[in-house]
Amino acid sequence: MNQERLYTVLRGPHISEKSTVIADGAGQVVFQVAPDANKKEIKAAVEKLFDVQVTGVRTVNAKGKRKRFGMIRGRRRDWKKAYVTLAEGQDIDFLGGE
């Protein structure tokens, strides 16, 4: 797998109320990922960038919402998120606190 591709797969963490509950209880982390990324690429990218062991990946394609920009109707772009299950006892800390 191309090393440059691994750095472009993950767009960033998806921080929401649901993702924080899942991170505390189920040992999962939620990422926004590239729309053309597959599960193998997501797993390899998380393992390489965060030095953790991934046991499973689930993906969801989210449709962009319809919005109005003044008088113009438009819509936000579609995006993809991945629920990454980490091995027992492993964690990713996005806030960097001690």
From Swiss-Prot:
GO biological process, one term: translation
Keywords: Ribonucleoprotein, Ribosomal protein, RNA-binding, rRNA-binding
InterPro entries: Nucleotide-bd_a/b_plait_sf (IPR012677), Ribosomal_uL23-like (IPR013025), Ribosomal_uL23/eL15/eS24_sf (IPR012678), Ribosomal_uL23_CS (IPR001014)
GO CC terms of this entry: ribonucleoprotein complex; ribosome
GO molecular function, one term: structural constituent of ribosome
Statement: the UniProt record of this protein carries the keyword rRNA-binding: yes
Signal peptide range: none
Family affiliation: Belongs to the universal ribosomal protein uL23 family.
Record HAMAP family: Ribosomal_uL23_B (MF_01369_B)
Functional note: One of the early assembly proteins it binds 23S rRNA. One of the proteins that surrounds the polypeptide exit tunnel on the outside of the ribosome. Forms the main docking site for trigger factor binding to the ribosome.
Subunit structure: Part of the 50S ribosomal subunit. Contacts protein L29, and trigger factor when it is bound to the ribosome.
Protein's UniProt name: Large ribosomal subunit protein uL23
